[in-house]
């Protein structure tokens, strides 16, 4: 191999090695830190230039973030039903009904109560309910997660529940009102009434007298029986039938209870069963009012009557006590009494049980007791044998029917009643007379007031007339002074008042009548004379308007 070939081969190897070495050196950045820094600067500069050339679209970025957030939202697992009467609701807007129902958030009364705060709270409550629409959403659960005052939360919660936007399709058994411990019967509550409100119950006292004894026995007071639940009617066939059964067998019996799906009340007599939703039952009231949702119709329900024999007929001590309490509280309002007893008891059951109670009659016992004491019967324990009891009853009836002083008592009673009515009528008549006298006095006082007012008006008119007369005299005096001054100035015209013209006309007429009387040619011919202003006798004639009519004008120069 020649030297030239060697020389040619060596550079080829060197060039190959040279070309392969740079990648190894570029990957080993620690060996050349200054090269890595320069490369990073160049990359950052190129990226900055690319970002400067590209414009950022914020709407697209926000949409991308929303799409990413949608991945973490809870999926809808239950169908949500909105009632037909709340079809105006739109979760993205605030309706006018909401503004009228919650005006605190829309009148700028507080900086914490704004439309945005209302909308956020409303949407949070609705979305929380829609996560589990079959469970009741309470106010406490909302309070724990919403930073708002309690009054506003209660208002919004009540508004949404009223319009069926929340708690519309819940299970009635999840309502807080139905959650509670079951009745065990060991708590007995007795009705306590103040002493002033208790009804008067006459004490059943039987006076006992012992004939032929050394001394009289003390009176024994038999108190009125308050706790009547210990007594039982042994002639009740249904109760006897229930008494024959064992308690263990009664406890094993299954008593079905049908609860209304809408209101949560118990449907006792009649229920409406849904043919499409087999677990849904409605009471008669909710069915008649149409509270069965928008996705059902009335034809989807069938009317079923509960079996009355399945209702529990026997009465417990607690129910008997509640019945007596209800009768004492509500008297003859049997519907309220049945509600007070509760359970499966109807109005008919309460009335039937009350009639079957062995309540004793105090009046008959008083008559029987007095008769027994009169005959010397044994009445220590209040119990009498059959024959003695019949004799006492017959004697009591005869004493009541054969009363000798009945007519006298009736006449005395009627006389007392008539006297009472006469006294009342006299008092009423006296009151009427007194009222009429007061009425007349008030009228007289008003007349006196009117009379004094008239007198004051009369004095006022007299003063005004005097004032006008003085003004007239002063005015005539001024006119005379003016006429004198006009005469001094050789002015032929004079000032004359209208009233003076009338007076001058009257004087002229009087002078003419006087001349006619002297000539014997009087117009009237009566021959009556009268004295004028200057003491001359003037004959009385006709009126001035007929003799010499004149047209008067206001005075002027």
Curated annotation (Swiss-Prot):
Zn(2+) binds at residues 260, 263, 283, 286. Residues 21-31 have a biased composition (Low complexity). Keywords: Chromatin regulator, Coiled coil, DNA-binding, Metal-binding, Nucleus, Phosphoprotein, Transcription, Transcription regulation, Zinc, Zinc-finger. Present with 3380 molecules/cell in log phase SD medium. The lineage of its organism: Eukaryota, Fungi, Dikarya, Ascomycota, Saccharomycotina. Residues 310-362 form the SANT domain. GO terms for cellular component: chromatin; nucleus; RSC-type complex; SWI/SNF complex. Residues 80-177 form the SWIRM domain. Residues 1-44, 510-544 are annotated as: Disordered. This is Chromatin structure-remodeling complex protein RSC8. Pfam families: Myb_DNA-binding (PF00249), SWIRM (PF04433), SWIRM-assoc_1 (PF16495), ZZ (PF00569). GO terms for molecular function: DNA binding; histone binding; zinc ion binding. The gene is RSC8.
């Amino acid at each position: 191999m020649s030297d030239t070939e060697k020389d040619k081969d060596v550079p080829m190897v060197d060039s190959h090695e040279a070309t392969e070495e740079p990648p190894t050196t570029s990957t080993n950045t620690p060996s050349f830190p200054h090269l890595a820094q320069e490369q990073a600067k160049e990359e950052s500069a190129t990226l900055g230039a690319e970002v400067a050339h590209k414009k950022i679209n914020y709407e697209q970025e926000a949409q991308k973030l929303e799409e990413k957030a949608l991945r973490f939202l809870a999926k809808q697992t239950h169908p949500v039903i909105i009632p037909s009467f709340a079809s105006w609701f739109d979760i993205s807007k605030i309706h006018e009904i909401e503004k009228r129902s919650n005006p605190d958030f829309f009148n700028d009364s507080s900086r914490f109560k704004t439309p945005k705060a209302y909308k956020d709270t409303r949407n949070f409550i609705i979305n929380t309910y829609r996560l589990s629409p079959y469970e009741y959403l309470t106010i406490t659960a909302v309070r724990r997660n919403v930073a708002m005052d309690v009054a506003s939360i209660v208002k919004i919660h009540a508004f949404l529940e009223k319009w069926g936007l929340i708690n519309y399709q819940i299970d009635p058994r999840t309502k807080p009102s139905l959650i509670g411990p079951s009745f065990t019967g060991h708590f007995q509550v007795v009705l306590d009434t103040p002493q002033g409100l208790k009804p008067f119950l006459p004490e059943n006292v039987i006076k006992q007298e012992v004939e032929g004894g050394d001394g009289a026995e003390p009176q024994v007071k038999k108190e009125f029986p308050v706790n009547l639940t210990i007594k039982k009617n042994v002639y009740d066939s249904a109760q006897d039938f229930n008494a024959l059964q064992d308690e263990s067998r009664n406890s094993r019996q299954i008593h079905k209870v049908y609860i209304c799906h809408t209101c949560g009340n118990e449907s006792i007599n009649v229920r409406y069963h849904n043919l499409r939703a087999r677990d849904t039952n409605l009471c008669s009231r909710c069915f008649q009012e149409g509270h069965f949702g928008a996705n059902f119709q009335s034809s989807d329900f069938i009317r079923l009557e509960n079996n009355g024999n399945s209702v529990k007929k026997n009465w417990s001590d607690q129910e008997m006590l509640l019945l007596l309490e209800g009768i004492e509280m509500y008297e003859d309002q049997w519907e309220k009494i049945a509600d007070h007893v509760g359970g499966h008891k109807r109005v008919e059951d309460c009335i039937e049980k009350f009639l079957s109670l062995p309540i004793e009659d105090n009046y008959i016992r008083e008559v029987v007791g007095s008769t027994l004491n009169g005959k010397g019967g044994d009445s220590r324990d209040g119990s009498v044998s059959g024959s003695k009891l019949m004799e006492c009853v017959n004697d009591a009836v005869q004493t009541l029917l054969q009363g000798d002083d009945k007519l006298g008592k009736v006449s005395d009673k009627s006389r007392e009643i008539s006297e009472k009515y006469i006294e009342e009528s006299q008092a009423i008549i006296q009151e009427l007379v007194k009222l009429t006298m007061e009425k007349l006095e008030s009228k007289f006082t008003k007349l006196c007031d009117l009379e004094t007012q008239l007198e004051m008006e009369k004095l006022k008119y007299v003063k005004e007339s005097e004032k006008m007369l003085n003004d007239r005299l002063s005015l005539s005096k001024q006119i005379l002074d003016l006429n004198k001054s006009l005469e001094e100035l050789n002015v032929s015209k004079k000032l004359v008042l209208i009233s003076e013209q009338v007076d001058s006309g009257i004087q002229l007429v009087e002078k003419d009548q006087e001349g006619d009387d002297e000539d014997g040619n009087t117009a009237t011919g009566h021959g009556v004379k009268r004295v004028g202003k200057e003491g001359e006798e003037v004959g009385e004639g006709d009126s001035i308007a007929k003799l010499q009519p004149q047209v008067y004008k206001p005075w002027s120069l």
